Amino acid sequence: MYVPEEIIETIKMIEYQNLDIRTTTLGVNLKDCADKDLDLLKENIYNKITSFGGNLVETANKVSQKYGIPIVNKRISVTPIGLIMGSTLKGLSNEEAIDACVEVGITLDNIAKEVGVDFIGGYSALVQKRATPEEKMLIRSIPKLMTKTDRVCASVNVATTKAGINMYAVKKMGEIVKETAEITKDAIGCAKIVVFCNAPEDNPFMAGAFHGPGEGDAVINAGVSGPGVVRAVVEQLKGKDIGTVSDEIKKTAFKITRMGELVGKEVASELGIDFGIVDLSLAPTPAIGDSIANILEAVGLERCGTHGTTAALAMLNDAVKKGGAMASSNVGGLSGAFIPVSEDAGMIEAVEVGALRLEKLEAMTCVCSVGLDMIAVPGKTPASTLSAIMADEMAIGMINKKTTAVRIIPVPGKDVGDSVEYGGLLGTAPIMPVSEFSSEEFIERGGRIPAPIQSLTN
């Protein structure tokens, strides 16, 4: 039985505190699409995705109207393309193989536009130990792909707690990001490339979503968003101890997650597809008041990035997980608090006033959901430095048995003090300083950082 106060509270959350379903993401298995013939492969991919996803947008809009809850994005994730290209690329030269991979990416882009989804993820490779020949070609094709597509997202898993860190892949991804920055406008292509450690197979959020090899034929995963709601709750707790703040955040996360699961299950039911998970992540937007940084400041920090930020974020992340886990038995994905600089108005302000630096962000990633996300750095930053930043973040994920990721943007022609405007959910990225000391010799070593002792769990 709902009481009037609860109904009014929900309306307030949606109307005044930016509560929404950030995404309903359809995951589609493409393993059965593999074929030696490139044209047949593309045809199989088209038929498979459109058969499941042709009505995704229409259905999500219908459910959104039914419950009065905004569903901001409708997305698709697919089986990592690196897993299905082997027979197609056999016997091709390197250039021919790269072009073939790009053609598949263009097919995905065309499908995304036809069915009306915002992004399609899964142009991916899982290379935490070693890369197969087709995965090497797929990785090499990423910069070219980004010049020819608008909605395709690429991700590469270069490390896991069980496998260690593939430093060859880390080195290559620094070069790939650098090349992509140089050939796409304002380095926008880099906003669609993620480097992962311990990548989840059921992540609904872009740019790192892919449909994992252990998933079924099709699934709907939902991602919620509620920083504005949490901030409003925290602002009502002036003078209360941290335990009380944590408890109230937990209760709020419970309500947000319930809503996410309700909508996700309804969309899945309407489409006749299994419901997978609800991702508990608090995902900010550039809108004022819809900020993770502002939550931390409401807890009592003058600015996000000052001493105490990591502790406050740890408390927030843990409270969100506890509340969400109580609300749903189907929790997955990344599930925590996102800290993407360009997509969070409070983070942008913190960088601009000098309160938040790359080193502090790295510390924050030890206790939050993902990693260094939407970080813009000077265009002159060498590829080896980009790789070294990735290696640091992969090490945090590997040792702590958690997902970490890097989405970094070296913007050509920009330096510290400048910013780059992407608009929409990607927001505005202030250029952040990186160390001027070289990591090149370390990165050039290649090889593999062995799996840590905590990987021996059997």
From Swiss-Prot:
Gene3D superfamilies reported in the protein's UniProt record: 3.20.70.20
Domain of life: Archaea
Coiled-coil spans in chain: none
Family per similarity comment: Belongs to the UPF0210 family.
Listed name of the protein: UPF0210 protein MmarC7_0672
The species this protein was found in: Methanococcus maripaludis (strain C7 / ATCC BAA-1331)
